[in-house]
Amino acid sequence: MVAIPDSSQDLLSIDEAISELATIRDFLRWSVSLFNEHQLVLGHGFDDPWDEAVALVLHALHLPWDTDVRIQDARVLPAERKVICSLLARRVLERVPTAYLTGVGWFAGIPFQVDQRVLIPRSPIGELIEKQFAPWIDPAAVESILDLCTGSGCIGIACAQYFPDALVDCADLSEDALDVAERNVLDLGFEQQVNVIYSDLFEALDGRTYDIIVSNPPYVDKQDMDALADEFHHEPRMGLEAGNDGLDIVRKMLPELSRHLNP
């Protein structure tokens, strides 16, 4: 686990450094250096510290992520510096992932609302969804999809985006997670296509069957869970840990799959 630096000393150094910065470009460059210096763990929606710095700084300035790069030479106001300082302190000193600080996690090209009730979207399933599971699936033949352990709803909603003629059920055992999923369904305009269900895997599905079943279930074993970097410990443990070998949920799921999958 990454050692947390002394908060009082480092917060002071962050505050002092920011007082010397003038433009958005200055803040981006310095944020990347800060992330590298403190060896922040990436992997919660960002592949490199530059992209993460852009997301954090632009969020603090109430600017969209795709703002024209020419604005990077604009000066940052004193009040804005304080907001950036506060966010950087939480990211560096507390190791809070950026997606939780901005409230947005991207998946399959879609922005999802996220908070610490759900995992931050990052499953490689997203690439398969964007390709409509080619070459294994005929997209035109897909009428129903189930997303088990849906969390934020990102996988199920992404399926709805890329299979517009399919009805999608998103199931989870966490009521907190389902609240977030429901909000994403409504905010993204999928309420006519996506249904959010409280269910322990298949238990509340009343024998329904589907053309596609997708899932990113908890898969981390107990030993690895305890050794994960601090960033991961801001996420709900229920969404990550799956027993001594990481397969508790998978073992429970597999015997039921064939009964709910259309031929």
Predicted feature locations:
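Alpha-helix termini
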Residues: 38-43, 133-140, 189
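N-terminal auxiliary segments of SAM/dcSAM-dependent transferases
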Residues: 2-108
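SAM-dependent Rossmann-like transferase core, predominantly class I methyltransferases
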Residues: 71-72, 76, 82-164, 171-183
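Charged catalytic carboxylate motif
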Residues: 27-30, 52, 83-84, 124, ...
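Active-site/binding-pocket entry motifs
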Residues: 62-63, 118-119, 219
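S-adenosylmethionine
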Residues: 128, 162-263
